Amino acid sequence: MMYPFMTLNDNTEIVHSEMKADGTVKVYIETPDVEYCFKHATCWLPDYKWEDIKGYSNLELAYFKQLIRNNAHLIIEFSKQRRRFR
C-alpha cells in the first residue's frame, strides 16, 4: 500500500510505502502531463536508488532528488509508523 506524503503546486504527488522487512521504502513521484499522461519516477530509500523514470527532464529530476534527500528522514519515520499500525 502507498501513503500520501506531499502534493506540490503543479499537482505532483509524492507517496511512499510502509517500510519493507529489509528496511527499504519505495517513494513514487507522479505528475500529470499532456504528452505522457503522467510523468513518474521511483526512488528506493535508504539507498536513493532511482528507477522507472519517465518524462522528467534532468532539471526536474535533480529537483526531486534534492527534495527526497531533504525529506528522507521524515519519509522513513512515517513508513516505520505505517508498518507498526497495519
Residues covered by each model-derived region:
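Negatively charged, low-complexity tracts enriched in Asp/Glu with abundant Ser/Thr
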Residues: 1-16
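Broad hydrophobic/π-residue packing in well-ordered secondary structure
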Residues: 4, 18, 79-82
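A short, structured beta-strand/loop element
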Residues: 15-57
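Acidic, low-complexity intrinsically disordered segments
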Residues: 55-86
